Amino acid sequence: MNATQAMIDLDDTEGLLAADRDGLLRAASTAGAQVRAVAAALDEGALDAVRGDDRPRTVIWVGGRGTAETAGAMLAATMGSRAAAPIVVAAEAPSWIGPLDVLILAGDDPDDPALVGAAASGVRRGARVVVAAPYDGPLREATAGRAAVLAPRLPVPDEFGLCRYLAAGLAALQSVDPKLGVDLAALADGLDAEALRNSAGREVFTNPAKALVERMSRRRVVLAGDCAATLALARHGSSILLRIAHQVAAATGLADALVALRAAADSGSVDPVEALFHDEEIDGPVAERLRVLALALDAEHSVVASRVAQLDDVDLVGAEDVPEGPGVSSAPVGAQRAEQQLAILAVRLEMAAVYLRLVRG
């Protein structure tokens, strides 16, 4: 930051909007619209080709780089135990793929060799293929009209495309296994409510995304998950903070984060008393303390809370942890499914990354 730049206050609505020259807040707020676009395509019959009386042997998710890969990990973690067929996340189409399998291709690049190669293999071996990517170029040629297509309908940067991939995967799973009871409309409503809670006009004490920025301020940040789903979410948050806010944040399992936190406390790396009397002009910059944001689903909330109860530098973050205040909508406790909670937390982390970038000017 140079002398002409200044920090923007999180409650300065006009300053935040003026600093958002790239439209990042708007892009981060489109998750609900992206899900509705997928639901509309589903209603229009986009996935009729993959429906069938027989359940698939395996559902295979081949994701490109970034958010598509993360979405596959989240779907496998949350839906794997409920789906009639096992969900496999792979970098390419497996050699055993055949007519009994469903192949979902997800990404933002129709020229991606991994997606194109997987598409060609899936079509050649008779698998039911779903394309959740721009349907153009080599990817279109590889499928030759023999795939169900859920191409993106809204132009959104890949950083904010996680919820679209989640919705596409849920739609495909629902098509081959109607007993799952996937509700894309409820997911979209929840994401719209989250975006509204995190809007620039809401003050920090009623805004979950801004509150996260406050917690991360002047700290070394670790995003931690205690299961496969929240660990995938932590990695997404780490990636988004780096790509959007240029903020380095580690992503790891909760057990590793707690070990590091206790080790830092035992070493006395930051003495609270010394920090109180620290003079940066004489003593130099004070060392930043570690802040662990423990991401938790509702089902594991009480267990994770008990593990971190005695630690001051750990904050528990759940989808339903919404500050109370006038005009702030909150989700009914325990009413959201795991995939909905993950999507809500993903939007919260994405908007926090945007605010972190904007306040730095």
Language-model features and meaning:
Residues 25, 58-80, 229-238, 299-309:
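Short, charged N-terminal beta->alpha structural module
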Residues 58-63, 220-226, 291-295:
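Short hydrophobic beta-strand segments
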Residues 54-196, 297:
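Glycine-rich phosphate-binding loops that contact phosphosugars or nucleotide phosphates
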Residues 1-40, 127-129, 133-148, 164, ...:
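Phosphate-moiety recognition in structured ligand-binding domains
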